[in-house]
Amino acid sequence: MSFYESVFIIRQDVSLNDIDKIVDDFAKIIKDNNGTIIKKEYWGLRTLAYKIGNNKKGHYYFLGLDITGNVKEELERKMKLNENIIRFLTIQADSISSEPSPILKNQSTENTPVIDVTINN
């Protein structure tokens, strides 16, 4: 198994409950294939660098994963098929840090609340 970091952007009009359902669907795929979610972070509703479709903002979500390449391909296939996900990127990593990501560190200096950070070791 290999480490992967995946970030996906969900449409701005999707509720937090629906975002949780999307992440739970991905978690089920990962666990059913003997993978592990090492870290997950909700980065909040952020302004996009450029408009994507009718979206000027998006909900950003990060997953740190320990999975096989086949599971990565299945996750990316599901992300492509999900109409609520407007962009995603998954890269292979050497390791997954247990520290909060730099984006969350920057958010803590702002007035934006952090809704979900989970680290599994």
Curated annotation (Swiss-Prot):
Alphabetical UniProt keywords: Ribonucleoprotein, Ribosomal protein, RNA-binding, rRNA-binding
UniProt xrefs under InterPro entries: Ribosomal_bS6, Ribosomal_bS6_sf, Ribosomal_S6_plastid/chlpt, Transl_elong_EF1B/ribsomal_bS6
Signal sequence segment = none
Which CDD domains does its entry note?
bS6 (cd00473)
At the top level, the lineage of the source is Bacteria
This protein's GO cellular component annotations are: cytoplasm; ribonucleoprotein complex; ribosome
UniProt lists the family membership as follows: Belongs to the bacterial ribosomal protein bS6 family.
Q: What's this chain's function? A: Binds together with bS18 to 16S ribosomal RNA.
Write down the NCBIfam families for this protein, in alphabetical order: S6
Kindly provide the name given to this protein in its UniProt entry.
Answer: Small ribosomal subunit protein bS6
Q: Which organism is it from?
A: Rickettsia conorii (strain ATCC VR-613 / Malish 7)
